[in-house]
Amino acid sequence: MKNLFFNKLQKKMGYLFHNNIILKQALTHRSFSSKNNERLEFLGDSILNYIISDALYNNFTNIPEGKLSQMRSYLVRGNTLAEIAREFCLGDYLILGIGEVKTGGKNRDSILSNAMEAIIGGIFLDSNINKTHEIVISWYKNRLYSMSLKNLKKDPKTRLQEYLQGNKFSLPQYYIKNITGESHNQEFTICCFIDDLKKSVIGYGKTRRKAEQSAAKQALLLFNIL
């Protein structure tokens, strides 16, 4: 039953592990066990940076080094990794300690992004660099090839507002759906609703502002304009 459960995640990610022990370790947070995903995260971080650097270098041949670095930072940062994790519903598969479960750890950006890096490290150990490159690029494809240097300087809420205004749609409404965790370590869940389109998306963050930005980014993804 457990293997079938993990198979759903692997299908979403587009990669089937040969060694399920590696996958389980990649999903295990330090709050649950000393045999956790931190070493895999260390490995995956370096591999992710290499893969994204390689993709940017070969696909943006006229962009100078400084701009390439800016683009890479945007793509490998924790918020972006957490968004990809949510596309896979990764939080539902994380192995967390009781304390993290109670405080909403499965929705926390830092835990999700670290797990994504660990999974990348795990795929590398389970296969090879070429296969890992193929899988990671499949996750990043839309983000990678629709990037705009101008838009990198604008936050998601601004970009969403400009897009909606430009298409004569109503402006988005943001409201708090949930708040979890202790007062010093809260996690906000924000709903972004666009009335004209009858569309709503969810964002998460440690502050209301960050959660609103996260929700706006999900809306941009919905419209395929990120």
From Swiss-Prot:
Main location per the UniProt record: cytoplasm
Task: Tell me the GO molecular function terms.
Answer: double-stranded RNA binding; metal ion binding; ribonuclease III activity; rRNA binding
The residues annotated as the active site are D45, E117
If you read the UniProt record, what top EC class would you report for this enzyme, in one word? hydrolase
Q: Which reaction does it catalyse?
A: Endonucleolytic cleavage to 5'-phosphomonoester
> Which co-factors does it depend on?
Mg(2+)
Keywords, sorted A to Z:
Cytoplasm, Endonuclease, Hydrolase, Magnesium, Metal-binding, mRNA processing, Nuclease, RNA-binding, rRNA processing, rRNA-binding, tRNA processing
Q: Where does the record place the DRBM domain?
A: 155-225
The entry's cellular-component GO terms read: cytoplasm
For this protein, the Enzyme Commission number is 3.1.26.3
The RNase III domain sits at 6-128
One Pfam family here: dsrm
Work out whether the entry's keyword set contains Nucleus. Answer: no
Q: Which GO terms describe its biological process?
A: mRNA processing; regulation of gene expression; rRNA processing; tRNA processing
Subcellular locations according to the entry: Cytoplasm
Cite the binding residues for Mg(2+): E41, N114, E117
Q: How does it assemble?
A: Homodimer.
The free-text function statement in the UniProt record for this protein reads:
Digests double-stranded RNA. Involved in the processing of primary rRNA transcript to yield the immediate precursors to the large and small rRNAs (23S and 16S). Processes some mRNAs, and tRNAs when they are encoded in the rRNA operon. Processes pre-crRNA and tracrRNA of type II CRISPR loci if present in the organism.
Family, per the entry?
Belongs to the ribonuclease III family.
Q: What is this protein called?
A: Ribonuclease 3
Organism in which the protein naturally occurs? Wigglesworthia glossinidia brevipalpis
